[in-house]
Amino acid sequence: MSQPLKYLGQGLAYALFAVVLGFFSTSPEYTHLPADYALVKLSFNHAAQRKKPCYERTDVELAKLAPNMRIRKDCPRERSDVVVELDMDGKQLYHVVLHPPGLSHDGAASIYRRLPVPAGAHRFVARLKDKEEGGFSFVREENITLAAGRVMVIDFKADVPGAPGFIFKN
């Protein structure tokens, strides 16, 4: 076969590949949400409070320990479960109990959840409990208007000075 025919065949193969690639880059049409829906993303990491408080060892307790283990303050590593609730218009949209990861159950619990909701004006209530006793440690209520096809992100920051808690980004 002659050299020009090889180049022509190779060019046609590349052109055919480009046409197929171009077709599948735009077709079939895909929509990630129905036309009248918006998306709520709940995403954050949070290390809960310790299950047991730190305590100081007495001199008698320290004397019983090996010399290399004599640390006055003892802090158990295990953390509490994180309970997260998200309500929309008075109805529970999401509820989860997150167990702390790690061998000692001392890691930060992580959450990532996509929740499709109808577009429009809604009242959201986000709650988080990160200690064993008592009710929810953090509660945030917000009236938000969600446009169709838009994404709202709900984040959580416990270390924000002045206003720790949930952050709604619309």
Regions found by a protein language model. Give the residues of each.
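Short loop/turn and low-complexity linker motifs enriched in small/turn-promoting residues
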Residues: 2-170
